Swiss-Prot record:
It is found in: Mitochondrion. Keywords: Mitochondrion. GO terms for cellular component: mitochondrion. It comes from Paramecium tetraurelia. This is Uncharacterized mitochondrial protein ORF17. Its main location: mitochondrion.
Length: 221
């Protein structure tokens, strides 16, 4: 299974590097893609054996000692292999998303840099003051400004405000979600375990008292 996994990883890296080299026309972009792929290859090469050793070997030894039946041991080993393969599959998928985002960014960069876009092609320009000063003292120009340019400008301002509000809200939500996750993680490590040990000790004390009461009853009878 590790040989199949590493073979598929190498095939993925080679095919992705060939695709990026074919898409990216500039040498700097191709070298950057090759650098990213090389970094991922070395991460998979050196991180995967250590992770597999720590996760699989220690956990399998633990299950071999704890579990008594062969079926439960085989099921735990099978589920553990599935978990490791799912982890590295997600890692490869996330890297593929990064590669596609980088390719799209390069294509958009070339499109924006090589093409000339004039503001006359858009209904709303850069400066509202220039649009206001360009109004001619006649009915047609004033009518066009009041019923076409100005409403579009208001709509553009509303869109920018709502877009900024959405971006800020999402960023705050993501930040506080990460903070809450860290708080929950630290709470689990430093607080929840203490409560768990405390109630575990209370349960053991209750069991011990019940056993002592049972022994006293037997002695009395």
């Amino acid at each position: 299974m590790p040989l199949i996994f590493y073979s598929s990883c190498c095939f993925f890296l080679v095919s992705t590097s060939a695709f990026c080299s074919w898409v990216c026309s500039r040498p700097s972009q191709s070298s950057l893609c090759s650098l990213c792929l090389s970094c991922l290859f070395f991460i998979l090469l050196f991180w995967s054996p250590s992770t597999s050793y720590l996760i699989l070997v220690f956990f399998l030894l633990y299950t071999c000692v704890v579990l008594q039946t062969q079926l439960a041991y085989s099921l735990s080993a099978f589920m553990n292999y599935i978990g490791v393969l799912a982890f590295f599959t997600r890692l490869i998928v996330q890297f593929l998303r990064l590669v596609l985002m980088f390719v799209v960014y390069c294509m958009m960069h070339d499109t924006v840099m090589l093409q000339n876009y004039s503001q006359k092609n858009f209904l709303v320009g850069d400066s509202f003051w220039e649009e206001l000063m360009s109004v001619q003292p006649n009915g047609t120009s004033i009518f066009f400004f009041l019923f076409a340019t100005f409403p579009l400008r208001l709509f553009y301002w509303c869109y920018e405000c709502m877009h900024t509000f959405f971006v800020v809200t999402v960023q705050f939500s993501a930040f506080f979600t990460i903070v809450f996750w860290l708080f929950l993680l630290f709470y689990t490590f430093f607080v929840y375990e203490k409560y768990e040990h405390h109630f575990d000790n209370i349960t053991k004390m209750h069991k011990k008292l019940i056993e002592e009461l049972k022994s006293l009853k037997k002695d009395s009878f």
